[in-house]
């Protein structure tokens, strides 16, 4: 799972470039503390906490999005299935498991596929500016 401060920095890059007006934070109720931390730490009003939404509410939020960025999770796969441009932040999972999906994986430089590393620190290799540039390239193509 990517770190909250990295999501905050990435969101700031998109917002400051005028590429979004608001950002849905999609997670389950058990991860609501993460959405709250992002909102509290950022002190920004453009975040919308969706942790209390049911599946229909999550689908509505995703369908109202121009694109989706997230960890390798259920909502990431749901976004791709709904036909939304979907970018997966992958550093600790095999990206090859996404080969039949519409998810565009963003991996750190030097990434090695087919290795499971269950250490969250591996996600620190994905820097917000790098992720932003990768997504921006894909959005413009």
Label each PLM-derived region with a short phrase:
Residues 77-141:
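Nucleotide-sugar donor-binding patch of glycosyltransferase catalytic domains
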Residues 4-91:
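Donor-binding and catalytic core of enzymes assembling or modifying cell-surface/extracellular glycoconjugates
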């Amino acid at each position: 799972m990517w770190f909250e401060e990295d999501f905050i920095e990435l969101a700031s890059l998109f917002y400051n470039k005028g590429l979004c007006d608001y950002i849905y934070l999609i997670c389950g109720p058990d991860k609501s503390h993460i959405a709250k931390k992002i909102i509290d730490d950022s002190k920004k009003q453009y975040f919308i906490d969706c942790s209390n939404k049911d599946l229909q509410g999550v689908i509505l939020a995703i369908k109202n999005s121009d694109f989706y960025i997230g960890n390798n999770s259920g909502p990431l796969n749901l976004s791709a299935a709904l036909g939304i441009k979907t970018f997966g932040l992958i550093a600790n999972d095999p990206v090859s498991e996404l080969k039949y999906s519409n998810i565009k994986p963003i991996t750190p430089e030097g990434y090695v596929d087919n290795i499971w590393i269950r250490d969250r620190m591996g996600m620190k290799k994905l820097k917000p500016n790098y992720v932003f540039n990768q997504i921006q390239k894909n959005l413009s193509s």
